Amino acid sequence: MNEVVAKGKKAKEIARELVLKSTNQKNEALAAIADQMIVETAYILEENKRDIEEGKAKGFSDSLLDRLMLNEQRIIDMAEGIKQLIELRDPVGECVSAWERPNGLSIQEMRVPLGVVGMIYEARPNVTVDAATICLKTGNAVILRGSSSAINSNKAIVSVIHRALKQTSLPPESVQLIEDTTRDSAKQLFTLNEYLDVLIPRGGKQLIDTVVREASVPVLETGAGNCHIFIDETADKQMAFNIIINAKTQRPSVCNAIETIVLHEKWAQQFGSELFSSLKERGVELRGDSKSLAIDSSIALASEEDWETEFLSLTLAVKVVSTTEEAIHHINTYGSMHSEAIITENEENVSKFFTSVDAAALYHNASTRFTDGSEFGFGAEIGISTQKLHVRGPMGLPALTSTKYVIRGNGQIRR
């Protein structure tokens, strides 16, 4: 029996145990993990340093190295995140709805764990902690499969989690890591229907598309973030500048950063040159259409591929349009249904944008950087779903549950 199958089988067994654990037992386990993370910070950083050094030797980009890098503050933040997770209401066992039928049957819809959750993800070691702890909070066993670039960090974090769980009533095997980072192990996970209840990919478009295309297990798609901001002709100049700069430069390597700005031509003719200069001063490389180049000839001409690309870096595409309808068409054509924004003082255009643009999160006069579980008040998230079934947008704790119906009677039979 190979590693993936063996760990899948074990996870299925563990899931039957976890469903019996109380909220207090789960929270005690989370507290132990948070404490152990702090105690073993030096060990985690030592292993993370190995990944960083190997990444530099392989020529990883600065944005990829940033996603891969851990430091003392990031580990403290992860531990604090776990403590905040403890304070969140446990959705398991919640009565979603209840009613009584004329025949006397009492029916309740109850929240239950999904069972075994698979996570396949790239680069970010913090996902190892997020996925493990959110799954434990919701009573799910989890199988983690990170990328080869973060294997040392992930192995260290999971070993720390195991040492913490040994001090609690939750089995250490509640969290398992697939240490084989070859393509074969990923493909096995895609088809682990006998043991896996859902597979959640987190990473770039290529990874997500591969999982969606090849997996036979149910998939919760956390789509890539090819996000846009549309500046219409009535947009306040300073507001538009502030939002665009924040959405692009605050942390360009994350999925809710923008990759394209769409400018109404009247606004662009008045303020475009100043905006472009402001972005370039902050290290942003601009790639625009012919109308953009007419405003600033130093901008590189955008290709078709640029409109489709999640850059995850300080590269930004620029599209100039004549109408709101043209902007919406461009966004719906190239967007990844993640987060899209409009900056405008025209309520009619807001309504049109909100009705017509197909995305998980739509913003009026605000940065797309707020698409995040903590910013939405969920307190924690397993990812941001861009699909429409089961859940959409930031996936908080209820997203890792299903429901079952509990029916109580006193001898009723169907006639």
Curated annotation (Swiss-Prot):
One Pfam family from the record: Aldedh
UniProt EC number: 1.2.1.41
GO cellular component: cytoplasm
Subcellular location as annotated: Cytoplasm
Reactions catalysed, as given in the entry: L-glutamate 5-semialdehyde + phosphate + NADP(+) = L-glutamyl 5-phosphate + NADPH + H(+)
Keywords in alphabetical order: Amino-acid biosynthesis, Cytoplasm, NADP, Oxidoreductase, Proline biosynthesis
Chief localisation class: cytoplasm
Family the entry assigns: Belongs to the gamma-glutamyl phosphate reductase family.
Functional note: Catalyzes the NADPH-dependent reduction of L-glutamate 5-phosphate into L-glutamate 5-semialdehyde and phosphate. The product spontaneously undergoes cyclization to form 1-pyrroline-5-carboxylate.
HAMAP family registered for this protein in UniProt: ProA
Record protein name field: Gamma-glutamyl phosphate reductase
Organism expressing this protein natively: Bacillus mycoides (strain KBAB4)
Gene assigned in the entry: proA
